[in-house]
Amino acid sequence: MRFQSFPRLLGLLLTVLLSTGCGAPPTPSAPRTAVPPPSATQQPVAPTSGYPAPATAPAGGTTLDTALSTPASAPGAAGCRSQGAPVSPYRVVATYPHDPTAYTEGLLYLGADTLYEGTGDWQNSLLREVTLSSGQIKREVKLREVAPPQPGAQANFGEGVAVVGDRIFQLTWQSGFGLIYDRASFTVLKRFTYPPAGIALPVEGWGLSYDGTRLIMSDGTAKLYFIDPEATFNTGVLALTGQVEVRDTGVPITQLNELEYVKGAIYANLWNCDLIARIDPATGAVQTYLDLSGLRTLLPITPNVTPEVLNGIAYDATGDRLLVTGKWWPSLFEIALPVARTYLPLALVAPPPPLTPLHWS
Protein backbone atom coordinates (compact mmCIF):
# COMPACT_ATOMS: atom_id res chain seq x y z
CA MET A 1 0.00 0.00 0.00
CA ARG A 2 1.38 3.44 -0.94
CA PHE A 3 0.12 6.93 0.13
CA GLN A 4 0.77 9.31 -2.83
CA SER A 5 -0.66 12.69 -1.55
CA PHE A 6 0.79 13.04 1.93
CA PRO A 7 2.36 16.54 1.30
CA ARG A 8 -0.96 17.93 0.02
CA LEU A 9 -2.89 16.51 2.99
CA LEU A 10 -0.35 17.96 5.40
CA GLY A 11 -0.77 21.39 3.75
CA LEU A 12 -4.55 21.15 4.12
CA LEU A 13 -4.29 20.34 7.81
CA LEU A 14 -1.97 23.32 8.42
CA THR A 15 -4.34 25.64 6.53
CA VAL A 16 -7.31 24.54 8.65
CA LEU A 17 -5.40 24.94 11.90
CA LEU A 18 -4.12 28.41 11.02
CA SER A 19 -7.47 29.72 9.80
CA THR A 20 -9.32 28.57 12.91
CA GLY A 21 -6.67 29.87 15.30
CA CYS A 22 -5.67 33.18 13.72
CA GLY A 23 -8.40 34.40 11.41
CA ALA A 24 -10.65 36.26 13.84
CA PRO A 25 -9.82 39.39 15.81
CA PRO A 26 -9.27 39.04 19.54
CA THR A 27 -12.05 39.92 21.92
CA PRO A 28 -11.83 43.41 23.45
CA SER A 29 -9.78 43.56 26.61
CA ALA A 30 -10.47 45.58 29.72
CA PRO A 31 -9.35 49.23 29.67
CA ARG A 32 -5.70 49.78 30.47
CA THR A 33 -4.80 51.26 33.80
CA ALA A 34 -1.96 53.62 34.61
CA VAL A 35 1.44 51.95 34.76
CA PRO A 36 3.90 53.89 36.90
CA PRO A 37 7.43 54.47 35.58
CA PRO A 38 10.04 52.04 36.91
CA SER A 39 11.90 52.99 40.06
CA ALA A 40 15.62 52.53 40.46
CA THR A 41 15.02 49.03 41.87
CA GLN A 42 12.37 47.88 39.41
CA GLN A 43 12.76 46.37 36.00
CA PRO A 44 11.19 48.30 33.11
CA VAL A 45 7.65 47.23 32.30
CA ALA A 46 7.40 45.17 29.14
CA PRO A 47 5.64 46.93 26.27
CA THR A 48 2.09 45.94 25.44
CA SER A 49 1.30 44.33 22.11
CA GLY A 50 -0.32 47.53 20.83
CA TYR A 51 3.05 49.24 20.40
CA PRO A 52 5.76 48.82 17.80
CA ALA A 53 8.87 47.00 18.89
CA PRO A 54 11.34 49.29 20.71
CA ALA A 55 14.24 50.62 18.71
CA THR A 56 17.82 50.47 19.84
CA ALA A 57 18.89 53.89 21.07
CA PRO A 58 21.79 55.51 19.19
CA ALA A 59 25.03 56.29 20.96
CA GLY A 60 24.36 58.71 23.79
CA GLY A 61 20.74 57.61 24.14
CA THR A 62 19.36 55.11 26.62
CA THR A 63 16.65 52.61 25.72
CA LEU A 64 14.03 52.75 28.47
CA ASP A 65 11.30 50.61 26.91
CA THR A 66 8.96 51.83 29.65
CA ALA A 67 5.22 51.42 29.20
CA LEU A 68 3.27 54.43 30.46
CA SER A 69 -0.44 54.88 30.18
CA THR A 70 -2.93 57.37 31.58
CA PRO A 71 -6.68 56.98 32.07
CA ALA A 72 -8.79 59.51 30.22
CA SER A 73 -9.82 61.34 33.39
CA ALA A 74 -6.36 61.79 34.85
CA PRO A 75 -5.17 65.39 35.25
CA GLY A 76 -1.88 66.64 33.93
CA ALA A 77 0.29 69.35 35.48
CA ALA A 78 -1.44 72.29 37.12
CA GLY A 79 -4.76 70.44 37.19
CA CYS A 80 -5.10 70.25 33.40
CA ARG A 81 -7.43 67.57 32.15
CA SER A 82 -9.30 66.43 29.08
CA GLN A 83 -12.73 67.91 28.49
CA GLY A 84 -13.86 64.75 26.75
CA ALA A 85 -11.34 63.72 24.10
CA PRO A 86 -9.62 60.43 24.97
CA VAL A 87 -6.09 60.25 26.37
CA SER A 88 -3.78 57.98 24.36
CA PRO A 89 -1.25 55.67 25.99
CA TYR A 90 2.39 55.91 25.00
CA ARG A 91 5.69 54.19 25.61
CA VAL A 92 9.10 55.71 26.26
CA VAL A 93 11.55 54.19 23.80
CA ALA A 94 14.75 56.12 24.55
CA THR A 95 16.10 59.12 26.39
CA TYR A 96 18.76 61.55 25.19
CA PRO A 97 20.73 64.32 26.91
CA HIS A 98 19.30 67.83 26.66
CA ASP A 99 20.80 71.16 27.71
CA PRO A 100 19.15 71.95 31.07
CA THR A 101 19.71 75.68 30.53
CA ALA A 102 17.61 75.64 27.32
CA TYR A 103 14.22 77.29 27.79
CA THR A 104 12.80 75.34 24.85
CA GLU A 105 10.25 77.13 22.67
CA GLY A 106 10.64 75.31 19.33
CA LEU A 107 12.05 71.93 18.33
CA LEU A 108 12.63 70.31 14.92
CA TYR A 109 14.24 67.09 13.71
CA LEU A 110 16.12 67.52 10.42
CA GLY A 111 17.49 64.00 9.93
CA ALA A 112 21.11 62.86 10.27
CA ASP A 113 20.89 62.88 14.09
CA THR A 114 20.31 66.65 14.03
CA LEU A 115 17.85 68.92 15.84
CA TYR A 116 17.10 72.61 15.47
CA GLU A 117 16.01 74.25 18.70
CA GLY A 118 14.70 77.72 19.42
CA THR A 119 14.91 78.91 23.02
CA GLY A 120 13.39 81.75 24.99
CA ASP A 121 14.59 83.91 27.89
CA TRP A 122 15.02 87.67 27.78
CA GLN A 123 18.80 87.54 27.77
CA ASN A 124 19.51 84.11 26.33
CA SER A 125 17.16 83.50 23.39
CA LEU A 126 18.89 81.35 20.78
CA LEU A 127 18.57 79.43 17.56
CA ARG A 128 20.84 76.40 17.67
CA GLU A 129 21.73 73.18 15.88
CA VAL A 130 22.15 70.18 18.18
CA THR A 131 23.24 66.56 17.84
CA LEU A 132 20.33 64.46 19.11
CA SER A 133 22.29 61.47 20.40
CA SER A 134 24.85 63.46 22.40
CA GLY A 135 23.13 66.79 23.08
CA GLN A 136 26.20 68.56 21.71
CA ILE A 137 25.59 72.07 20.37
CA LYS A 138 27.00 72.34 16.84
CA ARG A 139 26.30 76.04 16.29
CA GLU A 140 24.01 78.77 17.56
CA VAL A 141 23.06 82.41 17.15
CA LYS A 142 21.84 84.74 19.87
CA LEU A 143 18.79 86.92 19.24
CA ARG A 144 20.29 89.81 21.17
CA GLU A 145 23.13 89.85 18.60
CA VAL A 146 21.24 89.30 15.33
CA ALA A 147 18.20 91.34 16.43
CA PRO A 148 19.37 93.78 19.12
CA PRO A 149 16.57 95.69 20.88
CA GLN A 150 16.01 99.37 20.41
CA PRO A 151 17.73 101.61 23.00
CA GLY A 152 15.75 101.45 26.22
CA ALA A 153 13.58 98.58 25.00
CA GLN A 154 13.40 95.11 26.47
CA ALA A 155 15.36 92.32 24.78
CA ASN A 156 13.58 90.07 22.29
CA PHE A 157 12.21 86.78 23.61
CA GLY A 158 12.56 83.90 21.13
CA GLU A 159 9.68 81.55 20.39
CA GLY A 160 8.69 78.83 17.88
CA VAL A 161 10.76 77.79 14.85
CA ALA A 162 9.96 76.07 11.54
CA VAL A 163 11.98 75.10 8.47
CA VAL A 164 10.66 75.89 5.00
CA GLY A 165 13.08 74.73 2.31
CA ASP A 166 16.40 76.48 2.85
CA ARG A 167 14.97 79.00 5.32
CA ILE A 168 14.30 78.93 9.05
CA PHE A 169 11.45 81.01 10.48
CA GLN A 170 11.60 82.07 14.13
CA LEU A 171 8.97 83.98 16.10
CA THR A 172 9.42 86.40 18.97
CA TRP A 173 6.99 86.57 21.85
CA GLN A 174 5.94 90.20 22.30
CA SER A 175 8.27 92.12 19.99
CA GLY A 176 5.84 92.06 17.06
CA PHE A 177 8.21 90.50 14.52
CA GLY A 178 9.88 87.29 13.44
CA LEU A 179 13.16 86.42 11.75
CA ILE A 180 13.94 84.42 8.61
CA TYR A 181 17.39 82.79 8.54
CA ASP A 182 19.40 81.15 5.82
CA ARG A 183 19.47 77.52 6.87
CA ALA A 184 23.02 76.88 5.68
CA SER A 185 24.69 79.85 7.37
CA PHE A 186 22.27 80.86 10.17
CA THR A 187 22.46 84.44 8.92
CA VAL A 188 19.33 86.59 9.07
CA LEU A 189 17.80 87.13 5.63
CA LYS A 190 14.81 89.19 6.64
CA ARG A 191 12.46 90.33 9.37
CA PHE A 192 8.71 90.03 9.09
CA THR A 193 6.22 91.90 11.24
CA TYR A 194 2.95 90.71 12.70
CA PRO A 195 -0.13 92.53 11.34
CA PRO A 196 -1.69 95.25 13.52
CA ALA A 197 -3.45 93.67 16.49
CA GLY A 198 -7.05 92.77 15.69
CA ILE A 199 -9.75 90.38 16.71
CA ALA A 200 -8.78 87.84 14.04
CA LEU A 201 -5.01 88.33 14.04
CA PRO A 202 -2.21 86.94 16.20
CA VAL A 203 -0.99 89.40 18.81
CA GLU A 204 1.92 87.37 20.18
CA GLY A 205 4.21 84.71 18.77
CA TRP A 206 4.17 81.31 20.49
CA GLY A 207 4.41 78.08 18.46
CA LEU A 208 5.26 77.51 14.80
CA SER A 209 5.20 74.51 12.45
CA TYR A 210 5.02 73.73 8.72
CA ASP A 211 2.68 71.27 7.00
CA GLY A 212 4.48 71.24 3.66
CA THR A 213 2.42 74.12 2.28
CA ARG A 214 1.54 76.50 5.11
CA LEU A 215 3.11 77.71 8.30
CA ILE A 216 0.93 77.05 11.35
CA MET A 217 1.21 79.53 14.23
CA SER A 218 -0.17 79.75 17.77
CA ASP A 219 -0.41 82.89 19.91
CA GLY A 220 -1.39 81.51 23.31
CA THR A 221 -5.12 81.65 22.59
CA ALA A 222 -7.37 78.86 21.26
CA LYS A 223 -6.62 79.97 17.68
CA LEU A 224 -4.29 78.41 15.14
CA TYR A 225 -3.29 80.62 12.20
CA PHE A 226 -2.31 79.44 8.72
CA ILE A 227 0.35 81.51 6.97
CA ASP A 228 1.79 81.68 3.46
CA PRO A 229 5.58 81.46 4.00
CA GLU A 230 6.56 82.74 0.54
CA ALA A 231 4.29 85.78 0.74
CA THR A 232 5.59 86.46 4.24
CA PHE A 233 9.16 86.41 2.95
CA ASN A 234 8.37 88.60 -0.06
CA THR A 235 6.32 91.24 1.77
CA GLY A 236 7.96 91.21 5.17
CA VAL A 237 4.51 90.95 6.80
CA LEU A 238 2.92 87.83 8.24
CA ALA A 239 0.66 86.64 5.39
CA LEU A 240 -2.40 85.15 7.08
CA THR A 241 -4.47 82.79 4.90
CA GLY A 242 -6.85 81.28 7.45
CA GLN A 243 -7.44 80.27 11.03
CA VAL A 244 -9.26 77.71 13.14
CA GLU A 245 -10.35 77.64 16.77
CA VAL A 246 -9.29 74.58 18.74
CA ARG A 247 -12.06 72.94 20.77
CA ASP A 248 -12.48 69.79 22.82
CA THR A 249 -16.14 68.70 22.67
CA GLY A 250 -17.12 72.32 22.08
CA VAL A 251 -14.90 73.86 24.77
CA PRO A 252 -12.15 76.23 23.48
CA ILE A 253 -8.66 75.01 24.42
CA THR A 254 -6.46 78.02 25.11
CA GLN A 255 -2.72 78.49 25.70
CA LEU A 256 -1.70 76.50 22.63
CA ASN A 257 2.08 76.61 22.60
CA GLU A 258 4.75 74.69 20.63
CA LEU A 259 3.44 72.94 17.51
CA GLU A 260 4.42 70.00 15.31
CA TYR A 261 2.71 68.70 12.19
CA VAL A 262 2.56 64.89 12.32
CA LYS A 263 0.82 62.66 9.76
CA GLY A 264 -1.91 65.14 8.90
CA ALA A 265 -2.56 66.30 12.47
CA ILE A 266 -1.24 69.17 14.57
CA TYR A 267 0.37 68.26 17.88
CA ALA A 268 0.28 71.17 20.34
CA ASN A 269 1.82 71.65 23.75
CA LEU A 270 -0.50 73.37 26.23
CA TRP A 271 1.27 75.97 28.35
CA ASN A 272 1.26 75.21 32.08
CA CYS A 273 0.21 71.63 31.30
CA ASP A 274 2.16 68.48 30.60
CA LEU A 275 -0.40 67.66 27.92
CA ILE A 276 -0.09 67.46 24.14
CA ALA A 277 -3.29 67.85 22.13
CA ARG A 278 -3.67 66.12 18.77
CA ILE A 279 -5.75 68.46 16.61
CA ASP A 280 -7.59 68.11 13.31
CA PRO A 281 -6.31 71.11 11.29
CA ALA A 282 -9.49 71.27 9.20
CA THR A 283 -11.95 71.56 12.09
CA GLY A 284 -9.84 72.44 15.12
CA ALA A 285 -11.29 69.48 17.02
CA VAL A 286 -9.05 67.84 19.62
CA GLN A 287 -8.89 64.16 18.67
CA THR A 288 -6.78 62.83 21.54
CA TYR A 289 -4.37 63.95 24.24
CA LEU A 290 -1.04 62.69 25.46
CA ASP A 291 -0.58 63.20 29.20
CA LEU A 292 3.20 63.21 29.60
CA SER A 293 3.34 64.27 33.24
CA GLY A 294 4.85 60.86 34.04
CA LEU A 295 8.03 61.84 32.19
CA ARG A 296 8.98 64.11 35.08
CA THR A 297 9.73 61.07 37.23
CA LEU A 298 12.34 60.00 34.66
CA LEU A 299 14.25 63.31 34.70
CA PRO A 300 17.63 63.13 36.44
CA ILE A 301 18.23 65.52 39.30
CA THR A 302 20.34 68.41 38.02
CA PRO A 303 21.91 70.89 40.46
CA ASN A 304 20.51 74.43 40.29
CA VAL A 305 17.93 73.43 37.66
CA THR A 306 14.17 73.20 38.22
CA PRO A 307 12.45 71.72 35.16
CA GLU A 308 9.52 73.80 33.97
CA VAL A 309 6.58 72.86 31.77
CA LEU A 310 6.67 70.30 28.96
CA ASN A 311 7.42 72.13 25.69
CA GLY A 312 9.06 70.95 22.50
CA ILE A 313 7.80 68.40 19.96
CA ALA A 314 9.83 67.10 17.01
CA TYR A 315 8.83 64.41 14.52
CA ASP A 316 11.22 62.21 12.57
CA ALA A 317 9.14 61.27 9.53
CA THR A 318 11.73 58.83 8.19
CA GLY A 319 12.06 56.89 11.43
CA ASP A 320 8.47 57.58 12.55
CA ARG A 321 9.74 58.87 15.90
CA LEU A 322 8.20 61.46 18.20
CA LEU A 323 10.66 63.44 20.34
CA VAL A 324 9.59 65.58 23.29
CA THR A 325 11.26 67.69 25.97
CA GLY A 326 10.54 70.67 28.19
CA LYS A 327 11.79 74.04 29.38
CA TRP A 328 14.97 73.51 31.40
CA TRP A 329 14.65 69.74 31.08
CA PRO A 330 17.92 67.77 31.26
CA SER A 331 16.48 65.00 29.06
CA LEU A 332 14.74 64.61 25.73
CA PHE A 333 12.49 61.57 25.23
CA GLU A 334 11.61 59.45 22.24
CA ILE A 335 8.10 58.09 22.66
CA ALA A 336 6.02 55.61 20.69
CA LEU A 337 2.27 55.65 20.25
CA PRO A 338 -0.02 52.62 19.79
CA VAL A 339 -0.15 51.02 16.37
CA ALA A 340 -3.57 50.28 14.89
CA ARG A 341 -3.99 46.59 14.12
CA THR A 342 -6.17 45.16 11.37
CA TYR A 343 -7.45 41.63 11.00
CA LEU A 344 -8.44 39.80 7.84
CA PRO A 345 -12.01 38.43 7.98
CA LEU A 346 -12.32 34.70 7.51
CA ALA A 347 -14.43 35.26 4.40
CA LEU A 348 -11.45 36.93 2.73
CA VAL A 349 -9.01 34.14 3.49
CA ALA A 350 -8.31 32.22 0.30
CA PRO A 351 -9.75 28.68 0.47
CA PRO A 352 -7.32 25.77 0.18
CA PRO A 353 -6.89 24.16 -3.25
CA PRO A 354 -9.15 21.20 -4.04
CA LEU A 355 -7.94 17.82 -2.86
CA THR A 356 -6.53 15.33 -5.29
CA PRO A 357 -8.17 11.91 -4.86
CA LEU A 358 -6.06 9.55 -2.81
CA HIS A 359 -4.75 6.49 -4.56
CA TRP A 360 -4.27 3.31 -2.64
CA SER A 361 -2.47 0.26 -3.85
Question: Where on the chain are the PLM-derived regions?
Answer:
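Ser/Thr-rich, Proline-interspersed low-complexity disordered segments
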Residues: 13, 22-87, 342-360
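A short helix->beta-strand "capping" segment at the edge of beta-propeller domains
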Residues: 79-101, 134-135
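Beta-strand-rich domains and repeat architectures in extracellular enzymes and scaffolds
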Residues: 93-126, 146-147, 152-162, 326-330
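Surface loop/turn motifs at the tips and blade-to-blade linkers of beta-strand repeat domains
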Residues: 95-100, 141-153, 191-201, 244-251, ...
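Signature of short aromatic-glycine-proline-rich micro-motifs recurring in repeat-based ectodomains
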Residues: 104, 158, 256, 303-314
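Conserved beta-strand position repeated across blades of beta-propeller domains
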Residues: 108, 162, 207-209, 260, ...
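Short coil/turn segments that connect the beta-strands within blades of beta-propeller domains
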Residues: 112-113, 165-166, 212-213, 263-264, ...
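Conserved beta-strand positions in repeat-built beta-propeller and related beta-rich domains
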Residues: 115-122, 163, 168-175, 215-221, ...
